[in-house]
C-alpha cells in the first residue's frame, strides 16, 4: 500500500513545527511518511527522494524548512507532485527569511507557500487533504467533519476562564 503524503524537513529541529502537519494528517486518517532530507547537508538524499517520490506512490509533498529554506523549492524542481512549503520559525529572523525564500520561486517551479510555523504546518496538511479529497469521497467527508468540529469549538462569547 502506498503512502499518500511525504513530510520532509531539513533537520530534526524542524520536527517541532512539522509534527503539527503529521498530527493533522493522522487526525484525518491520511497516510504519511516523515523524513529528514536536507537540501544543504544531504543533497544526494534530496535528489533521490524528489526524483523518486512519485514512483514511491506519494501524491503530495509537504516540505518544512528554516533559514535559507531551499528544501521546498529544490524538491519542487525535481518532482511533478504538488509541493507545499512551510517556513519554520527561526531564531534570527522569526521565520521571515524562510518565508521569503520559499515564496519567491521562479515561474515554472511552483511551491504553495503557507504561514510561518505551526499554522503553516496545519494548513499544509489541510491543503494536502483537500487535494486528496478531490478523488476520495470518504476523505472529503472526514475533512468536512474536521471543519465542522473546528467551527463548533469556537465560543460565541469571550470567557475569563483559561
Swiss-Prot record:
Catalyses which reaction(s): 5-carboxyamino-1-(5-phospho-D-ribosyl)imidazole + H(+) = 5-amino-1-(5-phospho-D-ribosyl)imidazole-4-carboxylate
Superkingdom to which the source organism belongs: Bacteria
Residues that, per the record, bind substrate: 11, 14, 41
Q: Which SMART domains match?
A: AIRC
Q: Name one GO biological process term.
A: 'de novo' IMP biosynthetic process
Q: Which SUPFAM superfamilies match?
A: N5-CAIR mutase (phosphoribosylaminoimidazole carboxylase, PurE)
Q: Which InterPro entries match?
A: PurE_ClassI (IPR033747), PurE_dom (IPR000031), PurE_prokaryotes (IPR024694)
| Pathway linked to the protein | Purine metabolism; IMP biosynthesis via de novo pathway; 5-amino-1-(5-phospho-D-ribosyl)imidazole-4-carboxylate from 5-amino-1-(5-phospho-D-ribosyl)imidazole (N5-CAIR route): step 2/2
Q: What class of enzyme is it?
A: isomerase
Q: Provide this UniProt record's keywords sorted from A to Z.
A: Isomerase, Purine biosynthesis
The record, for Pfam families, names: AIRC
Q: Name one GO molecular function term.
A: 5-(carboxyamino)imidazole ribonucleotide mutase activity
The EC number on file is 5.4.99.18
Q: List the disulfide bonds.
A: none
Function (record text): Catalyzes the conversion of N5-carboxyaminoimidazole ribonucleotide (N5-CAIR) to 4-carboxy-5-aminoimidazole ribonucleotide (CAIR).
Which protein family is named in the record?
A: Belongs to the AIR carboxylase family. Class I subfamily.
Protein name per its UniProtKB record: N5-carboxyaminoimidazole ribonucleotide mutase
Q: What's the source species' lineage?
A: Bacteria, Pseudomonadati, Pseudomonadota, Alphaproteobacteria, Hyphomicrobiales
